Amino acid sequence: MIVIPAIDLKDGACVRLRQGLMEDSTVFSDDPAAMARKWVEQGAKRLHLVDLNGAFAGEPVNGEVVKAIAKAYPNLPIQIGGGIRSLETIKHYLDAGVTYVIIGTKAVKEPEFVKQACDAFPGHIIVGLDAKDGYVATDGWAEVSTVKATDLAKQFAADGVSEIVYTDIARDGMMQGVNIEATVEMARAGNIPIIASGGITNMDDIKGLMAVAHEGITGAITGRAIYEGSLDLAEAQAYCDAQ
């Protein structure tokens, strides 16, 4: 299992939101590329970038920053999410050196788009499923649907998605601990690798996820915890490597 630092981009800066609210953001750095360097130096094996403006605009807004980070680390897998709603955007990011593109809202609203993307760019597509009480949320978490996250996971696994980033939005940015039960349920439902996200606060969460990693949990995304110091990235990754 790899521990993946999140770099959330808003207006060209690296920020962190609480429960996905744009107005409730904390700026951690106005130099996202320097932030990326910091995490790489601490042993990051992949970076998770989110274009927050893009998620709300429905198209890339912080693309230049993403391109700069990808260029600086050509051998480091980078995944990007936020505002990815067309094959053109996916191609744009892959051409810029990004490894994986995360489809979020569009995957839920137009599931057939996921199949098209997987056919066009095999091995590069991740779906981001954000759920609250087991039901999928969309549009920067503004809307909660009547669709069960586990049902979609099965469908996307069949479409050829590489991994699913599963976020429990009730816990994201709240430092309450990760929802291990829901994450395992997702991995079992789709029989597809799951990257856990939302609520990862300290080493207890990393240990808890590692204990069930054999269920198909391949990664853990962490944001606020590593920025505020309740989790040490290097220590967390070293623990996972040693298991």
Curated annotation (Swiss-Prot):
Disulfide bond positions: none
GO cellular component, one term: cytoplasm
Coarse class of the protein's main subcellular location: cytoplasm
One example GO MF annotation: 1-(5-phosphoribosyl)-5-[(5-phosphoribosylamino)methylideneamino]imidazole-4-carboxamide isomerase activity
CDD domains, per database record: HisA
Catalytic activity: 1-(5-phospho-beta-D-ribosyl)-5-[(5-phospho-beta-D-ribosylamino)methylideneamino]imidazole-4-carboxamide = 5-[(5-phospho-1-deoxy-D-ribulos-1-ylimino)methylamino]-1-(5-phospho-beta-D-ribosyl)imidazole-4-carboxamide
Compartments where located: Cytoplasm
Domain of life: Bacteria
Keywords: Amino-acid biosynthesis, Cytoplasm, Histidine biosynthesis, Isomerase
Active site residues of this protein: D8, D130
Family annotation (InterPro entries): Aldolase_TIM, His_biosynth, HisA_bact_arch, Isoase_HisA-like, Isoase_HisA-like_bact, RibuloseP-bd_barrel
The protein's Enzyme Commission number: 5.3.1.16
Coiled coil, from the record: none
Biological processes annotated in GO: L-histidine biosynthetic process; L-tryptophan biosynthetic process
Pfam family, one: His_biosynth
Pathway as given in its UniProt record: Amino-acid biosynthesis; L-histidine biosynthesis; L-histidine from 5-phospho-alpha-D-ribose 1-diphosphate: step 4/9
PANTHER family the UniProt entry points to: 1-(5-PHOSPHORIBOSYL)-5-[(5-PHOSPHORIBOSYLAMINO)METHYLIDENEAMINO] IMIDAZOLE-4-CARBOXAMIDE ISOMERASE (PTHR43090:SF2)
HAMAP family: HisA
Family listed: Belongs to the HisA/HisF family.
Protein name listed in UniProt: 1-(5-phosphoribosyl)-5-[(5-phosphoribosylamino)methylideneamino] imidazole-4-carboxamide isomerase
Organism: Saccharophagus degradans (strain 2-40 / ATCC 43961 / DSM 17024)
